[in-house]
Design a protein with these regions (language model features):
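Extended, well-ordered protein cores
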Residues: 4-453
């Protein structure tokens, strides 16, 4: 694009120079003509001035139009593998100066209903042949921070059961992250009644504010960190409000961000107790995240250092699971197991029938809290049978292409060996059926551009 703009500028300059030369030539010829025709000099001068002014306006207008064609705003999805256009913050590592930023008031979700609003159809996979390992961030609208739908009640019940059964194994807050956890609680109590007024109602409780869940009757007291009059960890209170899991990263004096607060109840394949207190880099290396050292560590570190309260972002990922358990995938082993070599999708049962295959997609938001400086992850899991999403136009062909594009490291991380043969055979069959049924294959590219849907 920069080369194109440069060439256009050079071309415009040449046009201006040629125009000026032609003006001079024409003026000389014009004066000769006037002299031969015995026309008054004053009239000739006015005519020449008019012609010169008209030429200058034409050249100026062409340059103005060229300038307006140049891109003046950064793209909505920045490439964080390249150098960031923003300077690193002018503060020592581990020190945060509170920001005056206030989250914009959320607009009510149009026609939202606890019974009829369906989960958003995230399908965050792309056609091969290349699988790019990037952070995959895009800008977030503040209205979109938390997504709730007609699966809210089942998620709420499952979370309540997990809290009762596993308690601190799933929810922890370190003392140095308590201020961030309380700030997150305040943010949710401010946001949810604005975005979902038919489900949440803001309340005045004593000296502070609170919120009531109109479906469950729960009352949340921000000032007292209490639910229904009983004190609770603020992260536990937050977890009860929404369908997402939550994590807060806090920067220490070494410049690294540590997982110091979390409510991880529905992760499926990783445990908070294994990662709690770790820096971001160790969390990823201990989990064998593909390409982390080579492609992700530096841009991720830069991103966390530079993210500002007014600039939240989103990302999506996906996995294949071979059982129907949302909270913990039982096919990979016991949630309390201490396996040599770790536990993950690569320890799942092998070659189970496709009826046992589920599509597990995460929609994550990241934002910095303005007062405490903590960086909050919200992790919303969407969970559907493969046999359901494979009925959607283009999905089986696109998903099969994406799976085949995984490299060896990605394939191991996602457990492809455990289900690949069975799943790909099924997806190929469903894609062939769609093509035979008249699917416009040329339309696939248009669908792919709708990422992450």
């Amino acid at each position: 694009m920069s080369d194109l703009v440069t060439r256009l500028e050079e071309h415009t300059t040449r046009l201006a120079r040629d125009a000026q030369h032609h003006c001079t030539t024409i003026q000389t010829q014009f004066n000769t003509l006037l002299k031969d025709a015995n026309i008054q000099p004053k009239v000739a001068l006015y005519a020449a001035l008019f012609f010169a002014t008209f030429t200058w306006l034409a050249i100026t207008l062409s340059r103005l139009l060229l300038t307006r064609r140049r891109p003046t705003s950064r793209p909505s999805t920045p490439n964080l593998e390249k150098r960031s256009p923003f300077k690193a913050p002018d503060r020592p590592p581990g020190v945060w100066h509170p920001s005056p930023f206030t989250r914009p008031t959320a607009s009510p979700y149009p026609n939202w209903s606890l019974s009829t609003t369906k989960p958003l159809p995230y399908r965050p996979f792309r056609y091969g042949p290349k699988y790019n390992i990037t952070m995959g961030l895009r800008n977030m609208s503040w209205d979109e921070w938390i997504e709730l739908d007609n699966e809210y009640s089942s998620y709420h019940s499952l979370k309540a059961a997990r809290i009762a059964e596993r308690g601190e194994k799933c929810i922890k807050t370190a003392p140095e992250a308590m201020s961030a956890a309380k700030e997150l609680l305040e943010e949710l109590v401010g946001y949810l009644p604005q975005r979902y007024p038919s489900l949440f109602q803001e309340m005045k409780l004593g000296r502070g504010k609170g919120m009531k869940n109109l479906e469950t009757g729960e009352v949340f007291d921000v000032e007292g960190c209490a639910r229904d009059g009983e004190r609770e960890d603020p992260m536990k209170m937050c977890a009860r409000m929404i369908q997402d899991d939550l994590a807060i990263m806090v920067e220490k004096e070494d410049g690294q961000y540590y997982l110091l607060a979390g409510a991880i109840l529905l992760a499926g394949f990783w445990r908070l107790e294994d990662k709690f207190g770790m820096p971001l880099s160790t969390i990823h290396t201990s989990g064998d995240v593909p390409g982390f050292k080579d492609k992700l560590e530096k841009p991720m570190s830069n991103f966390f250092r530079r993210i500002q309260p007014q600039s939240p972002v989103l990302r999506n990922n996906y996995f294949i699971q071979v059982d129907d358990k949302l909270a913990w995938s039982e096919s990979i082993g016991s949630e309390d197991a201490k396996e040599d070599g770790g536990i993950g999708w690569f320890t799942a049962e092998k070659n189970k029938a496709v009826d046992h295959h589920w599509f597990r997609s995460e929609r994550q938001s990241l934002r910095r809290l303005p007062k405490s400086g903590g960086v909050v992850f919200t992790i919303r899991t969407y969970f559907h049978p493969i046999t359901d999403i494979a009925q959607e136009p283009y999905v089986p062909g696109r998903l099969a292409s994406a799976i085949r594009s995984w490299g060896e490291d990605v394939s191991r991380y996602k457990g492809k060996e455990m289900y690949g043969d069975v799943l790909l055979e099924y997806l190929d069959k469903k894609h062939a059926e769609q093509v035979e049924g008249g699917l416009d294959v040329d339309g696939e590219e248009d669908v792919a551009r709708g990422y992450p849907f």
